[in-house]
Amino acid sequence: HKNRFTICKLPRQSGKSTIMISYLLHYALFNPSVNIAILANKAATARDLLGRLQLAYENLPKWLQQGVMSWNKGSLELENGSKILASSTSASAVRGGSYNIIFLDEFAYVPSNVAEQFFSSVYPTISSGKSTKVIIVSTPHGMNMFYKLWTDAEEKRNSYIPIEVHWSEVPGRDEKWKKETIANTSEQQFQTEFECEFLGSV
């Protein structure tokens, strides 16, 4: 929460979406008039995340719920003035807006040219808001912008704080589970999606 720039390299099915949705919902409820962008490699994925956030909101006790001003597939606005937008990661997604949190989901799966255009277009928006948070979460997918940002964060060449989780930290995942998963998929797929290794190039 204290970090302005965070990058997370996480395995599949490790609860990353649930944790992020919970954090963003908490932030919107307890901070009035904030703008949050949920951006994913596909608009449908971002809308799905927003849908899950809306479901989490519905399951809150009534005393925690804010009044809802507008509620649709692409955005949510609360009575306290906080807004959450869901869109695909593109150069035009948040251009011209002012955001308190920009959450980039599965950033490694955003095509390299789009990822670069996004940052060159959006970084002025990020840097002008002195407290704007950028949270990048992804499973690796080749040597691309996510790879560069991650390795630079590890080497302290940028401002991102790197966070990673190993698949074995997820309850119920052991060597038996690993062997079964590899048998049902492939060694390479396991290395990328669960060991979170950067393989090949894109």
Which residues make up each language-model segment?
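Short, flexible loop motifs at catalytic/binding sites
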Residues: H1-V202
